[in-house]
């Protein structure tokens, strides 16, 4: 089934020069990048995006990090795009759960700065795309 999913290349991925390689991996997987924007997220967008974590102790650090520098927000489309992107991204914790060969397994060392984000379900994708790309 053709799906759309939100992807974020977080500030650490942008700052460390991984954007080109990440986009190449998306394309090699057969997914299509249909929207892409380099921006520095404002706090309101970040807080809305991460609202499920608002009562957790790391919420403030998460918002501070995602708004600290430019990131790339994008919409990826393709067959089973959500699962395909999550497979490319690797496990959330880059050392304990991300396999070498995945984006996080290759480029990240901490769970707090783990290079990329991807929606985890069709419902999350719809909600997150509306937050980051309200006119799409």
UniProtKB/Swiss-Prot annotation:
Cofactors that this protein relies on: Mg(2+)
Subcellular location: Cytoplasm
GO molecular function, one term: nucleoside diphosphate kinase activity
Top-level enzyme category: transferase
SUPFAM superfamilies per the UniProt record, alphabetical: Nucleoside diphosphate kinase, NDK (SSF54919)
Family statement: Belongs to the NDK family.
Role noted for this protein: Major role in the synthesis of nucleoside triphosphates other than ATP. The ATP gamma phosphate is transferred to the NDP beta phosphate via a ping-pong mechanism, using a phosphorylated active-site intermediate.
Name the UniProt record assigns to this protein: Nucleoside diphosphate kinase
Gene responsible for this protein: ndk
């Amino acid at each position: 089934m053709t799906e759309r999913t939100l992807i974020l290349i977080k500030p650490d991925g942008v700052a460390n020069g991984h954007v080109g390689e990440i986009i190449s991996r998306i394309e090699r997987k057969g997914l299509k990048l249909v929207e892409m924007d380099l921006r520095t997220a404002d706090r309101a967008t970040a807080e809305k995006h991460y609202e499920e974590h608002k009562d957790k102790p790391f919420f403030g650090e998460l918002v501070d990090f995602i708004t600290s520098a430019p990131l790339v927000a994008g919409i990826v489309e393709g067959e089973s795009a959500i699962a395909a992107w999550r497979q490319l991204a690797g496990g959330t914790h880059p050392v304990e759960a991300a396999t070498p060969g995945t984006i996080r397994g290759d480029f990240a060392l901490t769970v707090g700065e783990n290079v990329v984000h991807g929606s985890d379900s069709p419902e999350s994708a719809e909600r997150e795309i509306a937050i980051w790309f309200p006119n799409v």
